[in-house]
Amino acid sequence: QQILETAEKLGYIPDPMARNFSLRRHLSIGFLLPQMVQFSLQNPYTLQVIFGIGNVCEKYGYTLTLIPPLHKSITEAVRSAAVDGLITMGMQVEMEIVSVMQTRLLPYVTIDGTPDAQMPSVNIDDEQACFEIMRLVLEAGHRDIVLVSLSEDAFASPAKDQSVPNKRMRGYRRAMAEVGLELQKSQVLVSECTMEDGIRIGKEILARKIRPTCVVAMSDIVAIGCILACKQAGLGIPDDMSVVGFDNIDESSCIMPQLTTVDQPAKEKGRLAAEALFRMINKETLESVHMEIPYRIIRRESLKSR
């Protein structure tokens, strides 16, 4: 008590950083950006995930640190991150980054990653979602289809590969197989997850001798880029070509025509991942290690029946 009274008389203000150091806490959690900053923050899906995480951080009095790759290496960024825990996107258990986090004794949760006993995760059923939206495209009469993947490896990926692009590709192929179609490599293009690259992909599709009747993209922002490329070329959507996306970002219902898509609740993914991480930081038991949340197929004007 005497020490406290003396400190008050002297106008001493406790240093919160020193207190945090004594508790071995930084009062910050990190979110590993899936791409470099300029790409990640252009992606509305990623921004909604960040929004969901940020709301939970505010509730617990923590800051949120966005961690981009350091010298193009996300592993190096994790080695030096001053955080109490990490949320990642698309992480698989065999990645080097997992061993780095385990060595640092950092709790972590992955969004859109591979479910594993060692790695808490928040996902939707990506394969089934893509099966259902491709079935919708096929039921609309489309057979000349181009898929826009987010991974070079998705077309030839083994069945055991549980990355999101590969699970989505399996869903598309399964729906096509039901009607006797086999996906050809020439039908698959690869895009960065940006609108600019979506425009590039759209122009590449339009330059083909035989134009597809429908483009199915693994990302709304890429699908919207394709629509813009078509409009710039004077084509009508969906009269000249249908376009389908994935994510249900806000822009998908603002563009004309509105985009047919898969609604996955990005903000809720971020919220659930952050809540799970705080339970781990506080040494509490998780109610569920792997959380799978619902999705919805939303048909809008960008898909036309033939």
Description of each model-found segment:
Residues 1-27, 176, 304:
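N-terminal helix-turn-helix DNA-binding module of bacterial transcription factors
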Residues 9-10, 50-60, 102-110, 114-306:
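Bacterial carbohydrate/catabolite-sensing allosteric modules
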Residues 15, 43, 95, 162-166, ...:
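Serine-centered coil/turn micro-motif
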Residues 16, 23-135, 139, 207:
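Alpha-helical recognition/docking segments in bacterial nutrient-uptake
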